[in-house]
């Protein structure tokens, strides 16, 4: 994920404080320099870096850590609070009728973002419509139409019209029954006068309640000038940062937020319409520092399980917590995991895992895990309903038959059965837990997250990895 290098670098800087109970000025100076290097290498604006590091240095030297708090955890808390303050609050997005206009350069991800946002609003119970006004880029209409079909939301565009202002006007009329209108505008390879003139004309017609600037996370220092010009032209009320699943540094996009005195509204991190989330500064910085984000994790789990259950109404996820945990349940869990997004993003949300442990994994660990899950899915697709419902009936002869039918080796099938047994045992432990036990476990997870290292906190065996 983008900013992973920044997060890893910051965590590495803080880990140098392990074992220290108190800090002297040399310790603080060294850690501040490390933080400065981390932020500057991620393309965060120099003036922002200096202001942030000055605040961290002052607080680290002047504030007394609470009793029992290590020097590392004290500085971690300060860095967390200062980064949250730097990014600011999330853009307010009311769940009511409104018109939102997207602006940005060509290739920033506006068209994809418009469909993703429409999908997000639809999941909140509103009826959104995307109005595609980009007549400059070949294929813009087709791309927008296809993505809106995948998102199952209303769409308006006119491939035969070359007047974006007319399309915007007619689009509002054609989609008047929609609650939320999302107007996608054209971009250019650079900020040209005709782009600014066009977007100002469209704004005059649609009268948006909110203008969002869409920025590619890879934009770097160029984000500052781009943000300034769009803000002067139409006024930017919020920013959407896209392509967060890439390897870009991301600091330039964060700089643009500060430059426009706005805030971040959404984060885009994949190619499907579901790969979008509302920006929550506390959770975002928490993930960055390896502390997890249980709120976002629970939202993704709830959505994924709900969608999986809707596809198979005979399957009830609550039943597996009451009775036998079958391979069918495991299969459905894996389908739900696929819907939660890239595995590395999900792991970032688990306190104590996203930082310390994930940093130590081999570079290909995520790919290996995904390949293993794919193999498990192929194996289960080759099983009979009886075998899925009663894994204990899968003996040696059945293993050989399943291996032939799935094209997988017998060892991988045995791994699947062993993984199922581990998950079954873990679920039985949950069945025997009272509310107090569950609360203590979650508190333990949070504490491990605060330390940035920790382990899986008992979650090993809860999934096929």
UniProtKB/Swiss-Prot annotation:
Keywords: Cytoplasm, GTP-binding, Hydrolase, Nucleotide-binding, Ribonucleoprotein, RNA-binding, Signal recognition particle. HAMAP family: SRP54 (MF_00306). GO terms for molecular function: 7S RNA binding; ATP hydrolysis activity; GTP binding; GTPase activity. GTP binds at residues 104-111, 184-188, 242-245. Pfam families: SRP54, SRP54_N, SRP_SPB. This is Signal recognition particle 54 kDa protein. Disruption phenotype: Cannot be disrupted, it is thus essential. Signal peptide: none annotated. One of its GO terms (biological process) is SRP-dependent cotranslational protein targeting to membrane. The keyword Isomerase does not apply. Part of the signal recognition particle protein translocation system, which is composed of SRP and FtsY. Archaeal SRP consists of a 7S RNA molecule of 300 nucleotides and two protein subunits: SRP54 and SRP19. It is an enzyme of class 3 (hydrolase). The lineage of its organism: Archaea, Methanobacteriati, Methanobacteriota, Stenosarchaea group, Halobacteria. It catalyses: GTP + H2O = GDP + phosphate + H(+). It is found in: Cytoplasm. Belongs to the GTP-binding SRP family. SRP54 subfamily. Composed of three domains: the N-terminal N domain, which is responsible for interactions with the ribosome, the central G domain, which binds GTP, and the C-terminal M domain, which binds the RNA and the signal sequence of the RNC. It comes from Haloferax volcanii (strain ATCC 29605 / DSM 3757 / JCM 8879 / NBRC 14742 / NCIMB 2012 / VKM B-1768 / DS2). GO terms for cellular component: signal recognition particle. CDD domains: SRP54_G. It comes from the Archaea.
């Amino acid at each position: 994920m983008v900013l992973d290098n920044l997060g890893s670098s910051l965590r590495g800087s803080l880990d140098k404080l392990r074992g220290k109970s108190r800090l002297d000025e040399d310790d603080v100076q060294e850690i501040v320099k490390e933080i400065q290097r981390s932020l500057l290498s991620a393309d965060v604006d120099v003036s922002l870096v200096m202001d942030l590091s000055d605040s961290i240095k002052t607080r680290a030297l002047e504030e007394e850590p609470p009793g029992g708090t290590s020097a590392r955890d004290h500085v971690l808390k300060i860095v967390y609070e200062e980064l949250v303050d730097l990014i600011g609050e999330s853009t307010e997005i009311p769940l009511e009728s409104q018109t939102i206009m997207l602006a940005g350069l060509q290739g920033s991800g506006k068209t994809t973002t418009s469909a993703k946002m429409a999908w997000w609003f639809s999941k909140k119970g509103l009826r959104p419509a995307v109005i595609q006004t980009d007549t400059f880029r070949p294929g813009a209409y087709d791309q927008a139409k296809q993505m809106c079909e995948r998102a199952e939301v209303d769409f308006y565009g006119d491939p035969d019209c070359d007047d974006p202002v007319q399309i915007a006007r007619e689009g509002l009329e054609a989609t008047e029954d929609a609650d939320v209108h999302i107007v996608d505008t054209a971009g250019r390879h650079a900020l040209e006068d005709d782009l600014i003139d066009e977007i100002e004309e469209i704004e005059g017609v649609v009268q948006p309640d909110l203008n969002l600037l869409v920025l590619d996370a890879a934009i770097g220092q160029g984000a500052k000038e781009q943000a300034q010009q769009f803000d002067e032209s139409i006024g930017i009320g919020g920013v959407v940062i896209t392509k967060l699943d890439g390897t870009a540094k991301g600091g330039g996009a964060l700089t643009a937020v500060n430059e426009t005195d706005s805030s971040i509204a959404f984060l885009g991190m994949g190619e499907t319409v579901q790969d979008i989330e509302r920006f929550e500064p506390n959770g975002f910085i928490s993930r960055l520092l390896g502390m997890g984000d249980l709120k976002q994790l629970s939202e993704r789990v709830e959505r994924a399980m709900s969608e999986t259950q809707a596809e198979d109404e005979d399957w009830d996820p609550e039943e597996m917590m009451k009775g036998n945990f079958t391979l069918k349940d495991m299969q459905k869990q894996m389908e739900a995991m696929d819907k939660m997004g890239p595995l590395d993003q999900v792991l970032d949300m688990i306190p104590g895992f996203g930082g310390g442990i994930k940093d130590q994994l081999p570079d290909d660990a995520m790919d290996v895990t995904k390949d293993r899950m794919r193999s498990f899915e192929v194996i289960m697709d080759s099983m009979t309903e009886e075998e899925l419902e009663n894994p204990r009936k899968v003996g040696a002869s059945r293993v050989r038959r399943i291996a032939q039918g799935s094209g997988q080796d017998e060892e991988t099938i045995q791994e699947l059965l062993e993984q199922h047994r581990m998950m079954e045992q873990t679920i039985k432990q949950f069945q025997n837990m009272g509310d107090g036990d569950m609360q203590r476990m979650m508190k333990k997870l949070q504490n491990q997250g605060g330390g940035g290292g920790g382990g899986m906190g008992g979650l090993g065996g809860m999934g096929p990895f």
